[in-house]
């Protein structure tokens, strides 16, 4: 056990923080290709048809990513931008698709909170 003097001089080494978005390989965003676009149902007690896509990332890893917002234009072979961020009621979905980037269109007629959905300001 170290003495207080040794701790003052050296300090303790912290535990390294484990990443929750390993497939991004340390990047904030990654490009990928949709291999499958489908809907899935959330865990209890919620009920819906959540839109998700299987995406093969440029890092070579295939992940499941959530498609946020109402309506989308994605299909197989669409090029998308993927960011981290899980969906609490969908097990195994730890990534989000960025709306308004690459092949993904922004959400139509979105008035508030437009930034996350790639919607332009209505004139």
Swiss-Prot record:
Instruction: Identify the PROSITE patterns for this entry.
Output: RIBOSOMAL_S12 (PS00055)
A Gene Ontology molecular-function term? structural constituent of ribosome
At which residues is 3-methylthioaspartic acid found?
89
The family database entries (SUPFAM superfamilies) matched by this protein are listed as: Nucleic acid-binding proteins
Pfam families named in the record: Ribosom_S12_S23
Q: Cellular component terms, GO, for this chain's entry?
A: small ribosomal subunit
Q: Which domain of life is it from?
A: Bacteria
Subunit text: Part of the 30S ribosomal subunit. Contacts proteins S8 and S17. May interact with IF1 in the 30S initiation complex.
* PANTHER family associated with the record: 30S RIBOSOMAL PROTEIN S12 FAMILY MEMBER (PTHR11652)
Stored NCBIfam families? rpsL_bact
**Free-text function comment from the UniProt entry:** With S4 and S5 plays an important role in translational accuracy. Interacts with and stabilizes bases of the 16S rRNA that are involved in tRNA selection in the A site and with the mRNA backbone. Located at the interface of the 30S and 50S subunits, it traverses the body of the 30S subunit contacting proteins on the other side and probably holding the rRNA structure together. The combined cluster of proteins S8, S12 and S17 appears to hold together the shoulder and platform of the 30S subunit.
Name of the protein: Small ribosomal subunit protein uS12
Lineage of producing organism: Bacteria, Bacillati, Actinomycetota, Actinomycetes, Bifidobacteriales
